[in-house]
Amino acid sequence: MAASTDIAGLEESFRKFAIHGDPKASGQEMNGKNWAKLCKDCKVADGKAVTGTDVDIVFSKVKAKSARVINYEEFKKALEELATKRFKGKTKEEAFDAICQLIAGKEPANIGVTKAKTGGAVDRLTDTSKYTGSHKERFDESGKGKGIAGRQDILDDSGYVSAYKNAGTYDAKVKK
């Protein structure tokens, strides 16, 4: 088997990939998407000896029949199956050690994640102080939205007769 430092690094990598993309995940179980990401990011799936399909098949083999996730023990079984396929010329133990070294200490890569742009047009379009017309009514001085009060004129239905609307506004209309 792999050295104890490799096993600790392997378990740490398992936990990091298990919680990737899921804020509610505990890190004890990994889903198929994160398993495929681990194999791709750690170069276990090279596209030649081990493909994405092989990764998915091994995941299905090691998980329980009705389960959608694997735990750490099933993860190690899956790695053993992939190790013999990835490193064909080596013994089972050497192949497992080699695959553990590929994964140990790694964490999910965020390559291809879109960053927020800050260009001239974006600044101009998102600066609420530069809005004109009815759009500037939708935000207060700090730039925070007013909600429905900024989008609609809300009618005051507080008259003492059903047809009398906007109570208290007569004096403003008729100037003395």
Swiss-Prot record:
Among the record's GO biological process terms, what is one? Answer: decidualization
Q: Which residues carry this modification: N-acetylalanine?
A: A2
**UniProt entry keywords in alphabetical sequence:** Acetylation, Cytoplasm, Cytoskeleton, Microtubule
Pfam families from the entry? p25-alpha (PF05517)
Q: Name one GO molecular function term.
A: tubulin binding
Where does the record say this protein resides? Cytoplasm; Cytoplasm, Cytoskeleton
Q: Which terms in the GO cellular component ontology are assigned?
A: microtubule; microtubule bundle; perinuclear region of cytoplasm
What the entry lists under InterPro entries is as follows:
EF-hand-dom_pair, TPP/p25
Stored Gene3D superfamilies:
EF-hand (1.10.238.10)
> What protein family does this chain belong to?
Belongs to the TPPP family.
Function according to Swiss-Prot or TrEMBL = Regulator of microtubule dynamic that has microtubule bundling activity. Required for embryo implantation; possibly by regulating beta-catenin. Also required for decidualization via regulation of beta-catenin.
Q: What is this protein called?
A: Tubulin polymerization-promoting protein family member 3
Task: State the species of origin.
Answer: Rattus norvegicus
